[in-house]
Amino acid sequence: MATLNPFDLLDDDAEDPSQLAVAIEKIDKSKKSGQVSSLPAKSAPKLPSKPLPPAQAVREARSDAPRGGGGRGGFNRGRGGYNRDDGNNGYSGGYTKPSGEGDVSKSSYERRGGGGAPRGSFRGEGGGPGGGRRGGFSNEGGDGERPRRAFERRSGTGRGSDFKRDGSGRGNWGTPGEEIAAETEAVAGVETEKDVGEKPAVDDVAADANKEDTVVEEKEPEDKEMTLDEYEKILEEKKKALQSLTTSERKVDTKVFESMQQLSNKKSNDEIFIKLGSDKDKRKDDKEEKAKKAVSINEFLKPAEGGNYYRGGRGGRGRGGRGRGGVSSGESGGYRNEAAPAIGDAAQFPSLGGK
């Protein structure tokens, strides 16, 4: 008899004891039914000879439980959801619509998703309450497959707005059948050329030999040779021809100038030169006179008629004194009626170094 590990039951502290009791009762019922069925005829179906121990039965039930709604994070926040039997609903996929015969992919999605929705499925595709692990609530009639997006996130650089010309029809490159037909025609043409070219091989060799002979004959022209005397004669003839042309071209017809008359110029060249020289002399004299005219400074220093002569002076040094040369009181400088200084007076303008 096999020995059982008494410590296996320690892992089931979080389980509901009522669920364990129900599981044990089911195992006992299966034992009784197995004993009763062994007595009648052999036509009865065979049941397992040895029932599983309660700890192993609970472990298998836990392993078959769904990952989603019926599993962790159900409505009861426990590991078993509502109840292990109710959570499984007689099927390892939890609250899901049982798949048809042979639908292996669908059952695998349901088992993985728990509530009928596959892992990572989108909303509107799966089973009932509890939802998938990542899918949320979903419908029972969903296929369990990820829907194809209308616009995939792909780079559009280098792509225009035109359609690719892959198909056949007007405005396209053509069908693959046409290319195959063209290739077959080209292969057939090459084969026919080979057949035709193999037969007249001898004729081609003879024709090539004749061509080579003609080419050799054409490449050997005779060089033109002449002596030195002949060359000098040719040069003399060329010189004579050139001299005859030059003498004929240099002849001038004097008959054309006989009808022409000489016109007399009234003004002689000497008179013209004299006038030009006199104009230049006048301009020089005018410049010299302007430079020699002396202008006295008194003309610039004289005030206007009826004006006062201004002599600059210092302003008063009192509080808030006015600017230099302004109107002030006392003996300070201001506007006075004084005569202009005489430049010729030696007292006013003494010469430097004078005695």
UniProtKB/Swiss-Prot annotation:
InterPro entries with a match to the protein in the record: HABP4/SERBP1-like, HABP4_PAIRBP1-bd, STM1-like_N
Tissue: Expressed in seedlings, leaves, roots, inflorescences, and siliques. Constitutively expressed in seedlings and roots.
Phosphoserine PTM positions: S268, S351
A GO molecular-function descriptor: mRNA binding
One of the record's GO cellular component terms: perinuclear region of cytoplasm
Reported induction: By abscisic acid (ABA), and osmotic stress (e.g. polyethylene glycol PEG). Slight transient repression by salt (NaCl).
Location of this chain's protein in the cell: Cytoplasm, Perinuclear region; Nucleus
Biological process annotations from GO: abscisic acid-activated signaling pathway; cellular response to osmotic stress; cellular response to salt stress; regulation of abscisic acid-activated signaling pathway; regulation of translation; response to abscisic acid; response to osmotic stress; response to salt stress
Residues modified as N-acetylalanine: A2
Annotated TM spans: none
Phenotype upon gene inactivation: Larger rosettes and delayed flowering in long days (16 hours of light / 8 hours of darkness). Higher sensitivity to salt (NaCl). Hypersensitivity to the presence of abscisic acid (ABA).
Biased composition (Basic and acidic residues): 143-168, 191-202, 209-225, 277-292
Domain FF, first and last residues per copy: 234-289
Keywords assigned by UniProt, alphabetized: Abscisic acid signaling pathway, Acetylation, Cytoplasm, Nucleus, Phosphoprotein, RNA-binding, Translation regulation
Major location (coarse): cytoplasm
Motif Nuclear localization signal: where in chain: 132-139
Keyword Isomerase: no
Keyword Nucleus attached: yes
Positions of the UniProt region annotated as Disordered: 26-225, 277-355
Function description: Ribosome-binding protein that acts as a regulator of mRNA translation by promoting ribosome inactivation. Binds RNA. Regulates responses to abscisic acid (ABA). Promotes stomata closure in drought conditions. Involved in resistance to salt and drought stresses via the accumulation of Pro.
UniProt record similarity statement: Belongs to the SERBP1-HABP4 family.
The protein, known as: RGG repeats nuclear RNA binding protein A
This protein's encoding gene: RGGA
